[in-house]
A protein has these predicted regions:
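Surface-exposed patches in mature extracellular/periplasmic domains of secreted proteins
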Residues: 147-148, 224
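Oxidoreductase cofactor-interface core, primarily capturing Rossmann-like NAD(P)-dependent enzymes
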Residues: 8, 19-146, 157-166, 171
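Short beta-strand segments at enzyme active-site cores
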Residues: 14-16
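A structural alpha-helix within SAM-dependent methyltransferase catalytic domains
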Residues: 2-6
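A hydrophobic C-terminal alpha-helical subdomain
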Residues: 116, 154-228
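Short acidic/polar active-site loop segments enriched in Thr and Asp
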Residues: 11
């Protein structure tokens, strides 16, 4: 696709990176399919000489999407949660709105465009913990969630087991995504872990409570019942 973009005269390419930090070799080692993302960036770098610029966005987990489809280990309908370790590991996450704002800003603002030119860029709506999200969910729902726990090492073991040769079960892949995002290694803590430049998004961003309050009624069909 990058070669087709060059042939068509496209000047800027945003690859399908969105998500975990693929500049971290440990993350790519845990998630072997992400080697393909690394190879794509290597190819884009080889086409810079042909006038093709690129920006790769690291967003962390999709916050609103993760709440909708239980990727953050919260079942909003059943009022249950699976908390990794003590629930205090920090992870940066982005909503779809934040991702759209970042892309618009990169193309509309010359300073941001220069920051992002031929670079990996980090963005985030929030950097938070599972405990903070759980607190917001219980406040919005007015209901105490039933909590079970998993240790980081056990999540990694189960994920690797599912990814054994010949096993096509995506459950293992998603477990390893959660291991990277929610485990005690804090691979996705943009505020404290060194790595690519973080773009300061000019538009005001939502808080954890804002996102939870917006998504809870959409997912459950219930009205917000907790404290305001």
């Amino acid at each position: 696709m990058a070669d087709a973009a060059v042939a068509a005269g496209v000047q800027w390419f945003i690859p399908s990176e969105f998500g975990h930090d693929t500049t971290n070799p440990r993350v790519v080692e845990v998630l072997p399919p992400f080697y393909e993302k690394v190879k794509i960036i290597d190819h884009l770098r080889s086409r810079e000489k042909d006038g093709l610029n690129w920006t790769s966005l690291h967003t962390g987990f999709f916050f609103d999407f993760g709440l909708t489809f239980d990727l953050l280990e919260f079942d909003l309908r059943q009022k249950t949660a699976v908390i990794w370790d003590d629930g205090n590991s920090r992870s940066s996450m982005s909503t779809f709105k934040t991702i759209a704002q970042a892309i618009i800003q990169i193309f509309a603002d010359p300073t941001s465009r220069e920051e992002a030119k031929n670079q990996y860029i980090r963005i985030a709506t929030v950097t938070t913990t599972q405990n903070e999200i759980l607190q917001a969910l219980e406040r919005v729902s007015g209901t105490k969630f039933q909590v079970t726990r998993i240790e980081t090492a056990e999540g990694k073991r189960l994920g690797d087991q599912h990814l054994a040769p010949g096993d096509k079960d995506l459950a293992g892949f998603f477990l390893l995504l959660k291991y990277v995002a929610l485990g005690k290694n804090e691979f996705l803590d943009w505020e404290n872990r060194s790595g690519p430049h973080r773009l300061a998004i000019k538009a005001q961003q939502e808080s954890v409570l804002d996102v939870v309050g917006r998504m809870y009624p959409k997912v459950t069909g219930e009205v917000e019942r907790g404290e305001q």
